[in-house]
Regions:
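Short, strongly hydrophobic transmembrane alpha-helices
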Residues: 2-25
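Basic-flanked hydrophobic alpha-helices used for secretion and membrane insertion
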Residues: 24, 28-181
Length: 181
């Protein structure tokens, strides 16, 4: 009986300790990992492409791409000039130049790409192949993003250079419900 009780107490203690360890790890991931490269709280995906500058928030162009042989899609983020919602430096401390292309650390690891390598990917809408040279890596261990300027991202997608399909903001916006997907 004593052995069974001692074994039960040991198993219970192990379960409790495992729970504390997992909680700490998940707290670190949720508070540090998911927000490591983005600084906005709200992303509104629009039903249709719009052009220019939105009245509220900041314009963003997003488009999904496939990398051959990989199951994880690449999301290109077309960032507006002087954006306050995206990183401004690479892991190496270099300033981001929105005329170039940068990968998040998760994307770099997933696709096996380093700074200076060429990344080949295809637009999932028209299967057109694109090749870009990666100028740096941005720390973000949860998102497979390709960061570039809005003009570059729209050119990859074959739409007008002033187009956007998302609005991002730190605060909730009052947008027309018919505009938002």
């Amino acid at each position: 009986r004593s052995i069974v009780t001692a074994f039960g107490v040991a198993v219970a203690a192990f379960c409790i300790l495992t729970g504390f360890i997992m909680k700490d790890s998940l707290d670190t991931l949720m508070h540090g990992g998911l927000t490591s490269s983005i600084k906005y709280e709200y992303l509104y995906r629009l039903n249709a492409l719009e052009e220019g500058t939105p009245e509220q928030g900041e314009a963003l162009f997003q488009n999904y791409y496939e990398v051959e042989g990989k199951t994880v899609q690449l999301l290109a983020q077309g960032i507006s000039k002087d954006s306050k919602y995206f990183p401004d430096k690479t892991d190496g401390g270099d300033a981001l130049d929105l005329d170039k292309y940068y990968l998040t650390s998760a994307a770099a690891q997933t696709y096996g790409i380093k700074t200076g390598d060429t990344l080949t990917f295809s637009n999932i809408a028209d299967l057109k192949e694109h090749k870009v040279t990666i100028s740096g890596i941005v720390t973000d261990n949860t998102h497979c993003y390709l960061y570039t300027g809005r003009e570059n991202a729209t050119a990859l997608a074959g739409v007008d250079s002033d187009a956007y399909n998302c609005i991002i903001s730190k605060d909730a916006l009052s947008l027309d419900k018919d505009r938002v997907a």
